[in-house]
């Protein structure tokens, strides 16, 4: 799930954004 997180901005809260 870290790959998509980088697109969001590399925060690491991909689960929180889950866009």
Curated annotation (Swiss-Prot):
Keywords: Ribonucleoprotein, Ribosomal protein, RNA-binding, rRNA-binding
GO molecular function: rRNA binding
Cellular component, GO annotation: ribonucleoprotein complex; ribosome
Presence of keyword RNA-binding: yes
Entry's transmembrane regions: none
Family: Belongs to the universal ribosomal protein uS19 family.
Biological role: Protein S19 forms a complex with S13 that binds strongly to the 16S ribosomal RNA.
The name this protein goes by in its record: Small ribosomal subunit protein uS19
Species: Spiroplasma citri
């Amino acid at each position: 799930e870290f790959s998509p997180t980088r697109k969001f901005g590399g925060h690491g809260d991909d689960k929180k954004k889950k866009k």
